[in-house]
């Protein structure tokens, strides 16, 4: 297997707290898929939830080499945790086509956070 790309991202969580205060639900709607929005509505740490999802999606975009602003990239990546608490990705719409065209077979994702920052890495493999 060959590595297609590696993406890394670091986010300041406080930035998302300010965005939520200033723009309300507009920000989550730009970043999250429909399923993620439902999960978001139940979480207590909304800024951390958004920061984690955004940093993972940004790392994925960097790994594949496209802009997060192209064709609703952020809404077409769905991040969830499986039963073993491992991060998983579901691609939707345009992003699903890009991954197929790029022959992405495996996606390795990792994220960690502190009180101030989230850190994410994505490795895409053929």
From Swiss-Prot:
Q: Which GO terms describe its biological process?
A: fatty acid biosynthetic process
Signal peptide interval: none
Q: What is its EC number?
A: 2.7.8.7
The record's subcellular locations are:
Cytoplasm
Q: Which UniProt keywords apply?
A: Cytoplasm, Fatty acid biosynthesis, Fatty acid metabolism, Lipid biosynthesis, Lipid metabolism, Magnesium, Metal-binding, Transferase
GO molecular-function term, one example from the UniProt record? holo-[acyl-carrier-protein] synthase activity
Q: Which cofactor does it need?
A: Mg(2+)
InterPro entries, from UniProt? Answer: 4-PPantetheinyl_Trfase_dom, 4-PPantetheinyl_Trfase_dom_sf, ACPS, Ppantetheine-prot_Trfase_dom
The chemistry this enzyme catalyses reads: apo-[ACP] + CoA = holo-[ACP] + adenosine 3',5'-bisphosphate + H(+)
Q: Which family does it belong to?
A: Belongs to the P-Pant transferase superfamily. AcpS family.
So what does this one do? Answer: Transfers the 4'-phosphopantetheine moiety from coenzyme A to a Ser of acyl-carrier-protein.
Q: What is this protein called?
A: Holo-[acyl-carrier-protein] synthase
Report the source organism.
Buchnera aphidicola subsp. Cinara cedri (strain Cc)
What lineage is on file?
A: Bacteria, Pseudomonadati, Pseudomonadota, Gammaproteobacteria, Enterobacterales
- Gene name on record? acpS
């Amino acid at each position: 297997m060959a590595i297609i790309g590696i993406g890394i991202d670091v986010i300041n969580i406080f930035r998302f707290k300010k965005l939520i205060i200033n723009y309300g639900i507009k920000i989550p709607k730009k970043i999250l898929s429909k399923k993620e929005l439902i999960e978001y509505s139940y979480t207590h740490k909304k800024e951390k939830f958004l920061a984690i999802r955004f940093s993972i999606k940004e790392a994925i975009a960097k790994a594949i080499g496209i802009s997060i602003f192209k064709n609703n990239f952020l809404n077409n990546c769905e991040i969830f945790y499986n039963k073993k608490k491992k991060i998983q990705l579901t691609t939707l719409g345009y992003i699903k086509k890009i991954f197929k065209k790029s022959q992405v077979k495996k996606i390795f994702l990792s994220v960690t956070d502190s009180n101030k920052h989230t850190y994410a890495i994505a490795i895409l493999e053929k």
